[in-house]
């Protein structure tokens, strides 16, 4: 296990730098490394690491979502509120619907399986979007119109839509009797509950940090542990109505930055450093899940489905921003 982590870290740093030198995204290098050393490649990652791969990827995602929350500003959110709401569901629904129909006609998939495929592909990856948007914010690009904040906010809610619709199709596939209306109603409720829980948790942590004077590193660890507990809680809930834990995580960071700005700025710097390691783990382990033979077998038709999805997502983005100044 220790050797596997060493290979992931050293290889990830090397491939990240190499792809940067080629003017390609560094994350592509890390994904390529994962494919190369994963179980479908050279098989250099131990079974122990692969067994906890899902948990490691979740922790990495939590780290970048906390950092995203620490990068949001209330004034900007108010300014782009309406556009963010439309952008959070229209592009994803259009993309998912287009991919679903295309998969039915091209791959002759049953409707339920096509729907599952569609909303796996349509889900936005915060781990890709968030670092790029934070980089734009730090470099003061798009700040006047709030474009990075708009995308940050929309991407997190987009995921809730995609996951909920995917889980609905998955339930049908498993033969479960699912109330579609209740599932759809759960989307806005889970988002609102996620925000509420995030605000309450953020305020509670602020009060705790103000009373217990500890090093910022310990505050980061406590914040990370609380965020992990929230995601575990959501996964284990069996109630009809749930909450969006990833939005809660993001909201905690936002609340700390708004209510305790000095601490928020210090924590943001800490999470930037933590993300360097988390990013390596996340993208290399994602790459390790890729069966390159299956991907190659999809060939041109697989590429066509993705292309059609992106075209309809672009149409959704355009519709969402009609009437705005963007």
Residue ranges and their predicted role:
Residues 1-326:
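Transmembrane helical cores of multi-pass secondary ion antiporters/exchangers
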């Amino acid at each position: 296990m220790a050797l596997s982590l060493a290979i992931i870290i050293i290889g990830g740093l090397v491939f990240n730098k190499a792809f940067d030198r080629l003017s390609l995204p560094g994350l592509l290098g890390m994904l390529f490394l994962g494919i190369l050393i994963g179980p479908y490649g050279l098989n250099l990652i131990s079974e122990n690491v692969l067994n906890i791969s899902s948990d490691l990827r979740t922790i990495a995602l939590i780290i970048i979502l906390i950092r995203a929350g620490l990068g949001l500003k209330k004034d900007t959110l108010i300014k782009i509120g309406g556009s963010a709401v439309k952008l959070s569901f229209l592009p994803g629904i259009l993309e998912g619907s287009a991919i679903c129909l295309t998969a039915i006609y091209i791959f002759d998939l049953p409707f339920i399986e096509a729907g599952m495929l569609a909303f796996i592909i349509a889900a936005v990856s915060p781990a890709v979007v968030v670092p790029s948007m934070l980089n734009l914010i730090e470099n003061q690009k798009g700040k006047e119109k709030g474009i990075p904040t708009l995308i940050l906010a929309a991407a997190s809610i987009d995921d809730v839509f995609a996951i909920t619709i995917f889980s609905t199709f998955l339930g049908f596939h498993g033969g479960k009797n699912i109330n579609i209306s209740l599932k759809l109603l759960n989307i806005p409720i889970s988002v609102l509950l996620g925000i509420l829980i995030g605000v309450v948790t953020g305020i509670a942590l602020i009060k705790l940090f103000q009373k217990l004077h500890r090093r910022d590193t310990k505050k980061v660890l406590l914040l990370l542990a609380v965020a992990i507990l929230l995601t575990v809680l959501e996964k284990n809930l069996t109630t009809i109505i749930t909450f969006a834990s990833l939005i809660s995580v993001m909201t905690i960071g936002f609340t700390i930055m708004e209510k305790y700005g000095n601490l928020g700025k210090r924590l943001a710097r800490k999470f930037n450093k933590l993300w360097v390691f988390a990013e390596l783990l996340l993208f290399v382990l994602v790459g390790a899940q890729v069966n390159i033979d299956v991907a190659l077998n999809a060939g041109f038709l697989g590429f066509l489905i993705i292309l059609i999805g992106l075209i309809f997502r672009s149409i959704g983005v355009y519709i969402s921003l009609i009437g705005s100044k963007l």
